[in-house]
Amino acid sequence: MKKISSSLCWSLAGTALAVSATSCGSQKKETVQKPYNIVYIMTDDHTAQMMSCYDTRYIETPNLDRIARDGVRFTNSFVANSLSGPSRACLFTGKHSHANGFTDNTTCVFDGSQQTMPKLLQKAGYETAVIGKWHLESLPTGFDYWEIVPGQGDYYQPRFITMNNDTITKDGYLTNVITDMSLDWMENQRNKEKPFCLFIHHKAIHRNWLPELKYLSLYEDKTFPLPDNFYDTYEGREAAAAQEMSILQDMDIIYDTKMYRKDKDSRLKATYEDYIGRLKPEERKIYDAFYEPLIEEFYKKNPKGKELAEWKYQRYMRDYAKVVKSLDDNVGRVLDYLEEKGMLDNTLVVYTSDQGFYMGEHGWFDKRFMYEESMRTPLVM
């Protein structure tokens, strides 16, 4: 991660210095090439397995594939720390966690006084902005404009912290809202005399994978294939056996699979109630109308053992895929905007995630163990 991040920092900043000599007919003249704009899209927990330009077994991601088709797809991109805040700190600084000081999500506050990628870009003449997830505790530095979600953010009716340190609520689904704000900044708020670098940072596809309402029924008829090692026994691997990421044992029946009933309890039930409590009354009716038949069927069947593990896996995969669908839509909106404005050929579009994720491999979800599915991340530009 250090090698990739630091070299990327310098290569992005270096575009401001690019010049080219062109010829037109018989007349030769030197023209200064405008520095490339940069749109850096980062998502949370989006694993390469769930992008069709990397893996065709699961879903189609046509807009993400557009970036790969017209650019470069990195097949060996790995993070230095597969945890949201620490991974982002590595990205911005080009330093490993022990060197940048942000080693975990619970006790650390990012030191914004150190050198970062956006600061280098500012020095190179860029206008910089970040919109969406920040997750570094301190307020952003090195940005001319920012508006960030507090903590993990809310999928529904999301809250944002403004540059005035006010917390406001915006209407809609977070992935759409972040894109709306990003397009508005590019169209109406930036200095159009300067090159820009916009970091579009999504909460998606972070746990607990709450879908956009229009996609609630998507993938419900799809049966996702089980990974070959779904029933891993962890023989000879005590550390792996001790992990608390088991789909069967650790995936919360209410918070993660949405099998919510007031007379049932789970460790994360209250958090789930807070999340879906952000829906408007008319939205909650749509949400409940979809999940209530699933809930009734689940508690009637009351699956156990392998049947429960595979049922949880299918619910997990379907909800995760639905959130990816909204994300892919919004990547398409950004690409379409740049194309419509005649900016696409002069803009470097980067898409990546802060880490990978287990999609049932080793019987797991989450990312907190150092196997490839956790450390490997998609990177296209």
Predicted regions and their residues:
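Formylglycine-dependent sulfatase
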Residues: K2-A16, A21-M381
